[in-house]
Amino acid sequence: MLQNQEISKKEKYNIDKLQKRLRRNVGEAIADFNMIEEGDRIMVCLSGGKDSYTMLEILRNLQKSAPISFSLVAVNLDQKQPGFPEHILPAYLEQLGVEYKIVEENTYGIVKEKIPEGKTTCSLCSRLRRGILYRTATELGATKIALGHHRDDILQTLFLNMFYGGKMKGMPPKLMSDDGKHIVIRPLAYCREKDIERFSQAKGFPIIPCNLCGSQPNLQRQVIADMLRDWDKRYPGRIETMFSAMQNVVPSHLSDVNLFDFKGITHGSEVVDGGDLAFDREEIPLQPAGWQPEEEDARLDELRLNVVEVK
């Protein structure tokens, strides 16, 4: 009995610690990119997956103690896929007392009509879904649209574009929508997928399967995801370092003439970003940048939280 109580205490401690880390990650992303401002009405796109559930939970948590006032409205798009459990999200959101809207649009029927059997339907489905969400945001008077993409999604997109698209382009934490009418934010931009997975399991979110449409998975994205997971296991810190690199771009040491004026360099030009080291190799840190062992991460989390609580 006593042993079970000790295990329960430890589990609760670990869940609390995990939630605090996710909360800190989301808070830092919001601050770094000015994602949420006074009076914002945030449309939280809820798919029924682990990422969007976690995003809603953390935003609700932050809302209680934030120095600014903002409101949340959860939106789910019921695409009329066979077997979609349409009762789950309304019941969950009503239990939470969260304002919500279920948008019913038969995009499934449109996609099935346009795309041959066995082909990936994600591209067309995504375009249709995007248009409906933009329209819904306008109808609800939302000032921001929050999507549940996390750090791993952002890195996957970067490598997909590098390997298959020939460009260095990731997934922005905050940007104007392609129709020029909405601001899209990704509050989970600094969050690790493995943290979200653990948090989702601990909270027991009522997960809705994402493959109800029967579409074939995006094999290219799956290959990239498997590669990153393998690197994370074999080379601790590599994922963190790559994400840090996305925040520390040096245009003068790349080859994009639109980002840096290489043609304008002449004798007498100033030295930029340390200049060219010719044959000398740049010193590389022994430890990956932006990474710290799990134990140290936990210790620093505790220290930061204590400081915040004292304040």
UniProtKB/Swiss-Prot annotation:
Cofactor: Mg(2+); [4Fe-4S] cluster
Pfam families linked: ATP_bind_3 (PF01171)
InterPro entries in the cross-refs: Rossmann-like_a/b/a_fold, TilS/TtcA_N, tRNA_Cyd_32_2_STrfase, tRNA_thiolation_TtcA_Ctu1
Pathway: tRNA modification
Single GO cellular component term: cytoplasm
UniProt-listed GO biological process terms: tRNA thio-modification
Record NCBIfam families: PRK10696.1 (NF007972)
Family: Belongs to the TtcA family.
Name by which UniProt lists this protein: tRNA-cytidine(32) 2-sulfurtransferase
Lineage start: Bacteria, Pseudomonadati, Pseudomonadota, Gammaproteobacteria, Enterobacterales
Gene name of the encoded protein: ttcA
